[in-house]
Amino acid sequence: MSPFKTTDNPNEEEWELAHALRSDGFPYDRMGYLDCLGINWMALQSEDLILPFALGRSKWGFKQAFCPFGAQRLGPLGRAADDPERLREALDALPRLLRLRLSMSRPTGWNADRGWHWRKAGWERWYSAPNYELRLDGSYEALHQGYSSQTRRNLAKASGNQLWEYSNPEELWNYFVQNQGGKYAIPKGYEQAMKTAMYHLLHQGRGAVWAALGEGNQWLAGIFVAFSGDRALLLFSATTPEGRESNSMTWLINEFITMAVGRWKVLDFEGTSAEGLARFYQGFGAVNVPYLRWERWNAPWQLP
């Protein structure tokens, strides 16, 4: 008999206890945050591990388990969160849906990436997704020494005539749509979900919005940072053309780093497949700490 059970009504108290046992806590592992995304949630649970996932339908109409936008990686939680064998057992115990595509933290010792292969009556694969993190140990001066020469030049150009101010999710989202919205496919419902999630974290004291303002209080760049344990996570950002010209995002993140040193241990820039963004994060000394993506198609005759 499997030690795992699937529940469509996760116990929030149990979930919080499991979250507390995880060495790296992420804001989107908490049920309060996940509920803001407006998704139907389920979890695979045992005594020592919880694996959350969203349940929905694809654009072709079939049921699937997935991780939505706004929750880059979900779990695993619990004492066995870093045990690769237990994670493999959990993945095998997931409901027999046609498609499963999950993102999660990569346990220590997880096997190397593997392309599509046949396993237990289904095709599956797992691969590493990039995620950039900056350790905030030590002094700001030491961190600054780790900046790339390009980042230091951009920072020198950006200094002066910029102010650090609190902003709000509505303003940040509007500037994102105006200036970056055409570059990205924004899923239906994502706007309301992301705003709700940001306001939830603000009200919980687990997030803040900051902006760089130029002359005449001109809005140049903004970031939303979520806080979870020892981790500060750059969840959302936007910049204007004027902000790009004046290197305002470089200035704004540097200002955040000066404040964050001694408060958190990690600044998590989140993942990106865009080479330009990756270089930007690496310019502050961030290194790639990949997470795990797993995808499976079950054979139709295995479906309930």
Language model features with spans:
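A conserved beta-strand-loop-helix scaffold within acyl/acetyltransferase catalytic domains
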Residues: 2-47, 52-61, 112-244, 283
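A structural signal for short, well-ordered beta-strand segments and their strand-loop junctions
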Residues: 45-52, 98-105, 164-167, 266-269, ...
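Conserved acyl-donor/pantetheine-binding loop and adjacent beta-alpha core of acyl/acetyltransferases
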Residues: 57-73
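A short, structural micro-pattern
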Residues: 70, 94-96, 125-128, 228, ...
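The substrate-binding groove and active-site-proximal loops of carbohydrate-active enzymes
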Residues: 72-80, 242
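Extracellular structured ligand-interaction cores
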Residues: 73, 99, 129-131
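Aromatic (often tryptophan-rich) hydrophobic motifs at membrane interfaces
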Residues: 86-92, 196-303
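Conserved beta-strand-loop-alpha-helix junction that forms the acyl-donor binding cleft
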Residues: 102-112, 269-277
